[in-house]
């Protein structure tokens, strides 16, 4: 029996990288997965990977910067699979600028995708998590099961990162949201935790080519490697496994935790 057998999970930013790895890993462990990404091509590719392995998924291209889109996504997932048990708030982008060059447009964009989407998706999940637990408490005195919310923050919120004032502010906001929701939702047996990846091999950390919006200079990549005790960059699957642990019954007494997945990176 899989560690998430019979559970229904929503994973945002699931078209690539950490989100895709998490959605696939959850499906391998028995969860039905709502695969959310604003890019329909990558989202459908993730669903195809899940389906090829015998798993169940539903693709959603909802742009959860809008609350209504988040509500529609959760409703569709509950209609398709009967419930919502797990939320993985993973959607994120970087748009790097030194602070004196940072404008409102880039500030708002990065805060929207990294933080506002997490607020909307989690808020839209309350009827399926908190309200479901309240009904169980009214009937029996206690919630029937633990339900789970996880976030992807970043080790950059701990260390700071030159050129990423918008990104680190958003990821710091995720930490505050995680710890506050852990307190608010704990009485309903809803565990709320976050994973803080270090340097993970994704398109956001690939060597930046001239004209690219994302990626980082190769010199910075090599400097980052020198700070990692385990001597390698992380892979999306490393982070997916952390989300899986926190979403599983093995973590039923863990809440409000920020779990670094950084290979012993200095400062984490």
Give the label of every model feature segment:
Residues 40-41, 61-73, 104, 237-238:
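The beta1-alpha1 cofactor-binding region of Rossmann-like NAD(H)/NADP(H)-dependent oxidoreductases
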Residues 122, 170, 178:
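Active-site helix of classical SDR
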Residues 154:
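Residue(s) in the substrate-gating loop at a strand-loop-helix junction
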Residues 159, 242-244, 255-268:
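Short C-terminal tail/terminal secondary-structure segment
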Residues 186, 191, 254-256:
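Short, small/polar-rich loop/turn modules that mediate ligand/substrate recognition or access, typified
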Residues 197-207, 211:
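Short, flexible catalytic-loop segment of classical short-chain dehydrogenase/reductase
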């Amino acid at each position: 029996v899989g560690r998430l057998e019979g559970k229904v999970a929503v994973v945002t930013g699931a078209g690539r990288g950490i989100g895709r790895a998490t959605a696939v890993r959850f499906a391998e462990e028995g969860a039905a997965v709502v695969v959310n990404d604003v890019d329909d091509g990558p989202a459908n590719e993730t669903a195809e990977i899940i389906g090829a392995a015998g798993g169940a998924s539903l693709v959603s291209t909802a742009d959860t910067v809008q609350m209504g889109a988040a509500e529609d996504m959760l409703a569709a997932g509950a209609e398709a699979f009967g419930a919502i048990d797990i939320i993985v708030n993973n959607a994120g982008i970087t748009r790097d600028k030194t602070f004196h060059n940072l404008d409102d447009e880039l500030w708002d964009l990065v805060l929207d995708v990294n933080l506002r989407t997490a607020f909307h998706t989690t808020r839209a999940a309350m009827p399926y998590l908190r309200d479901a637990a309240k009904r169980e408490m009214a009937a029996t005195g206690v919630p029937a099961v633990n339900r789970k919310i996880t976030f992807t923050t970043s080790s950059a919120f701990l260390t700071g990162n030159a050129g990423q004032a918008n990104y680190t502010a958003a990821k710091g906001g995720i930490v505050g949201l995680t710890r506050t929701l852990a307190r608010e939702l704990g009485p309903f047996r809803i565990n709320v935790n976050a994973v803080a990846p270090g340097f993970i091999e994704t398109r956001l950390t690939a060597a930046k080519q001239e004209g690219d919006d994302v990626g980082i200079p190769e010199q910075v990549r090599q400097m980052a490697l020198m700070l990692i005790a385990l001597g390698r960059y992380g892979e999306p699957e490393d982070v997916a496994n952390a989300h899986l642990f926190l979403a599983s019954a093995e973590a039923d007494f863990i809440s409000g935790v920020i779990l670094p997945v950084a290979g012993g990176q200095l400062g984490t």
